[in-house]
Design a protein with these regions (language model features):
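Generic protein-terminus/edge-of-domain signal
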Residues: 1-66, 73-76, 108
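Residue-level recognition of the GNAT/N-acetyltransferase active site
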Residues: 55, 95, 195
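Short, Lys/Arg-enriched, Trp-marked, Pro/Gly-tolerant hinge/linker segments that flank
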Residues: 122-128, 141-206, 210
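Recognition helix of helix-turn-helix DNA-binding domains
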Residues: 212-214
Length: 214
């Protein structure tokens, strides 16, 4: 099977922004495998049965999912067994350099470790997700998303997440039973499916994506 293009996304996050928050209901997943240079914290609810692809990791997710993805790490979701009813997503993107002047300070040590572990994707425990849900919603529902208060909220959220001792670093493993048992083709088949189905929907109006090769 040939190599699959990975779309290079230009996010709406500008050099003048500290971070970007997006929340949206979803009726399914059809965005292709993509990569961008910003860190991304992605929260999903009511998406049990969907597949999460981060780097070379392929996993079927539960009804709650929260993952931190470092910049430059390819990622995507696929419907798989998800009934796609009432899916809700919160996505937070921030520059890798946001905490550069602070990250080596003692108070930020756990956050630094968390960011390092996010290079292959970092999934948080269900207990942590249940404890942080309200803070994520408060951040995403604020009518002044650029406020300094929201920046402090983001720092608090990241600090709390960095203390999750049950957080799990993703590895190059396919844990989806009966999805694709061929180790050689498992990733290529999933990624090619996402890519080809997206190409059927793409229009000339989309200008912010440039294919790069894995």
């Amino acid at each position: 099977m040939g190599k699959v293009d990975v779309l290079k996304e230009t996010t709406p996050l500008s050099s003048e922004d500290c971070f970007l928050v997006m929340q949206r209901p979803k009726s399914g997943f059809n965005f292709p495998l993509h990569v961008h240079m910003e860190f991304e914290l992605n929260y999903l609810e009511n998406a049990a049965g969907a597949i999460r692809i981060v780097g070379d990791s392929v996993e079927e997710i539960d009804d709650l999912d929260l993952v931190l993805i470092a910049g430059g790490t390819k990622h995507a979701y696929s419907n798989h067994k998800c009934p796609c009813n009432g899916i809700f997503e919160i996505t937070i993107q921030f520059h890798k350099s946001l905490f550069d002047s602070l990250i080596n300070r003692r108070h930020f040590k756990t956050m630094k470790d968390m960011f390092d572990n996010a290079s292959s994707g970092l999934v948080f425990s269900r207990e942590m997700i249940l404890g942080i849900q309200d803070k994520l919603r408060m951040l995403s529902n604020d009518n002044k998303p650029d406020s300094f208060k929201n920046l402090l909220r983001l720092v608090e959220i990241l600090k709390i997440l960095s203390l999750d001792k049950a957080a799990r670093r993703l590895n190059a493993v396919n844990t989806v039973k009966n999805y694709n048992n061929n180790d050689t083709d498992r990733l290529d088949s999933i990624m090619l499916y996402l890519h080809e189905n997206y190409q059927k929907r793409i229009t000339p109006k989309i200008r912010n994506y440039h294919p790069i090769h894995d």
